[in-house]
Amino acid sequence: IAELEHGSRAAVFSSGMAACTSAIMAVCKAGSHVICMRDVYQPVTRFLENFCIPKLNMAVTYVSGNDLGEVEDAMKKGASLMILESPATFVFRVVDLKAIADLAHKYGVRTYIDNTCMTPIFQNPLDLGIDIVMHTMSKYIGGHSDLIGGVLVSKDDELMKQIIQEMREWYGGILGPMEGWLAIRGLRTLHARLMQHQSTAMEVAEFLEKNDKVRKVYYTGLKSNPQREIIEKQQRGHTSLMSFVLDASVEQSINFINNLKLFGKGCSWGGFESLALMPLYKSSQEELDFRNVDRQLIRIYCGLEGAENLLEDLEQAFNRL
């Protein structure tokens, strides 16, 4: 994985969150200031809000990541770390990684990114100046929904030495041998699987975009994506995750998901099975406003089933709206 990410060293962990929290604790200390994108993986913000702030007296500034002026203003306050995800959770917004990395180097801020949904096949943040890359190996790297693990990669040997000898050892988030073997197995087919995932997802996204019952589609591969210039600059391909909003109520959107037959219901994507869910329909209005997303947002993951079968399943669910 270090070689695929063009890093000098990698460290594997027992979960993605074990990797994430180890990176944060390696860079930060009590009283540190952290900058975090608003739409990162929800457990990351819960870790910051429920542990780092109350127990370590850390300060956290949330930013969109797209407003470089906002990012620079936050960095001027003396931050230790900026936490990124691009494309980000829920609506797959991308941020200009090189521009942010350049600002971070200017102000002495470390940068960390969750690169899980891109994998090293489609995006290499270290080449753009990002300091630490994390992958949840439970997703595409594992590829079969039978593995929990995480990995950190960096070009900074001293930082990786600290993460391995201190954070991983002290917190005990060490990957088991069976999980390591499963991750190696997954890496052997990663490229082939991603090519199929991407091809299927493109067909599904274009199908959704043309459907008059769909209000909005969020997918980095669509030609209509307003962030296309940034996407083409830093990505070599596209995830098979996407989200969309129906021109319908929350209840109708729930029924739409329940009427799907081939798509399973679940959140831990990355395996062979296509999945659908409404990740935020029980969220507070405050949470929705914070992340700037719709309650009835539907996220789907395109697995390895035939594209024509997935389209047929979506079509029959639309017909029952």
Residue ranges and their predicted role:
Residues E49-N50, D73, K77, R193, ...:
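PLP-dependent enzyme catalytic core of the Aspartate aminotransferase-like
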Residues V214-I298, C302:
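Conserved C-terminal alpha-helix-loop-beta "cap" of PLP-dependent enzymes
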Residues Y171, L260-S268, A317-L321:
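A common structural junction motif
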Residues L4, L208-D212, L260:
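Acidic-histidine catalytic/liganding microenvironments
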Residues R9-K213, Y218:
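Conserved PLP-enzyme active-site core in the AAT-like
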